[in-house]
Amino acid sequence: MNKNELKPAVVFEQFAKINEIPRPSKREEKMIEYLKNWGESRGLETKVDETGNVIIRKPATKGYEHLKTVILQSHMDMVCDKLVDVEFDFDKDAIKTYVDGEWLTAEGKIGRAHV
């Protein structure tokens, strides 16, 4: 399997875009801007509060307005940890990933996930 075969494709395409954005803790400005632009470009109500939380609201699909609201929450930063012998600048470098068997792995083993 290669990265282009990961499903659902739209999720992994978005994941690849996010991996291009350096976002160590306390320095999430680029990620905040990316998410803000993402919401606004889709015509969604988008705001950033005074502490840097990005809130994107999507109206219910027609016919589902009576159902409970769904909230998705996540942190924007990443844990900046790597092997000692790996050169990686968490303030500047994009995360490069590849598929290793059943694992999506970052070069330098700075992260991995079962696929």
Regions found by a protein language model. Name each.
Residues 64-112:
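Active-site metal-coordination/substrate-binding segment of hydrolases
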